[in-house]
């Protein structure tokens, strides 16, 4: 009734009692109500979920506004299961309010688009103003202008504002350089968790740092997917180090798939519904070939490339109804 969204729905488990509040409700999970309809629209070209659930989406944002103090949210799990010399669980590397408020800003930006799509001019103005106020409050609270860093300077602290457009104009390069420096300081390893992974991966990819992404993942050490494979895991595990316990069948570390498809295979949507696709494969390191396919509304799109001497040979098959444009990186 109050607009809140639980981390799991339906709630087969009720998180109640001392210390359970953040499990009962966390913005990083609740924002799915707003994000998922747009993912559905972008992939299938169907905006019906946005129209059908617009009031619910709007109500959730209104609820978060009641929980915010000066537009800052201070509850939730944060960058759950981030990595470091500590027991995995609640975010340790990155302040929970930074993560929660960044997600609050993100879904308000989505709601601007949603209001435009349903033709609600009043809401569009309201959400536009709210986004500006959250952005200003976020930077006032977490941005250290002299150092060009956010929060603790962790990888998640820096990736979130860079990816979501919270960083002050003109400071993006300096903040990005601090992110790169932190990755190198950690031996080209990540320190992010369930939430921060995606923003770290896509921040690097969108800034042309695929080589660093490849270096960060092409090893068999902890933290990394290679270690899980070496350990013998047949599904993704909840912790970067499966030996530490928790679930051995958990999809939450699977954000690297987006990099596989968008960057390595180079499959990028140019139009909602993917009736138009841009193919822009990226070569990295000693990788000799990549092959990928995805099911579209129109059929299967397949892309493969391989190195032939000092050249790259690209092949693709697209279904009828899907227009493809091949770009050279």
Task: Give the residues covered by each predicted segment.
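Active-site acid/base region of carbohydrate-active enzymes
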Residues: 1-11, 43-102, 115-163, 170, ...
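Non-catalytic C-terminal accessory modules of carbohydrate-active enzymes
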Residues: 129, 211-329
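Solvent-exposed loop and edge beta-strand segments that line ligand/cofactor-binding
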Residues: 16-30, 86-103, 140-158, 164, ...
């Amino acid at each position: 009734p109050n607009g809140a969204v639980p981390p799991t729905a339906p709630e087969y488990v009720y998180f109640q009692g001392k210390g359970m509040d953040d499990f009962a409700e966390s913005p990083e999970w609740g924002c799915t109500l707003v994000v998922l309809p747009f993912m559905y629209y972008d992939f299938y070209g169907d905006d019906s979920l946005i129209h059908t659930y617009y009031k619910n989406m709007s109500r959730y944002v209104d609820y978060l506004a009641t929980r915010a103090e000066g537009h800052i949210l201070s509850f939730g799990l944060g960058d759950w299961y981030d990595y470091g010399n500590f027991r995995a669980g609640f975010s340790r590397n990155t302040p929970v309010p930074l993560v929660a408020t960044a997600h609050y800003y993100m879904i308000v930006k989505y709601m601007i688009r949603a209001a435009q799509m349903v033709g609600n001019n009043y809401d569009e103005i309201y959400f536009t103003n709210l986004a500006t106020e959250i952005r200003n409050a976020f930077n006032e609270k977490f941005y250290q202008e002299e150092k060009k860093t956010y929060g603790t300077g962790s990888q998640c602290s820096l990736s979130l504002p860079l990816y979501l457009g919270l960083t002050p104009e003109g400071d993006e390069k300096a903040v990005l350089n601090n992110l790169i420096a932190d990755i190198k300081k950690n031996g080209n390893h990540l320190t992010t968790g369930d939430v921060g992974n995606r923003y770290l991966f896509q921040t690097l990819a969108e800034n042309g740092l695929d080589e660093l992404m490849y270096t960060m993942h092409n090893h068999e050490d902890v933290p990394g997917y290679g270690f899980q494979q070496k350990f013998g895991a047949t599904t993704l595990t909840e912790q970067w180090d499966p030996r530490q316990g928790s679930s051995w069948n958990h999809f939450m570390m699977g954000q690297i798939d987006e990099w596989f498809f968008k960057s390595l295979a180079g499959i990028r949507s140019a139009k909602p519904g993917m009736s138009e696709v841009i193919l822009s494969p990226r070569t990295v390191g000693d990788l000799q070939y990549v092959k990928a396919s995805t099911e579209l509304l129109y059929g299967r799109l397949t892309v493969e490339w391989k190195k032939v001497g000092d050249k790259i040979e690209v092949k693709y098959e697209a279904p009828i109804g899907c227009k493809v444009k091949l770009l050279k990186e």
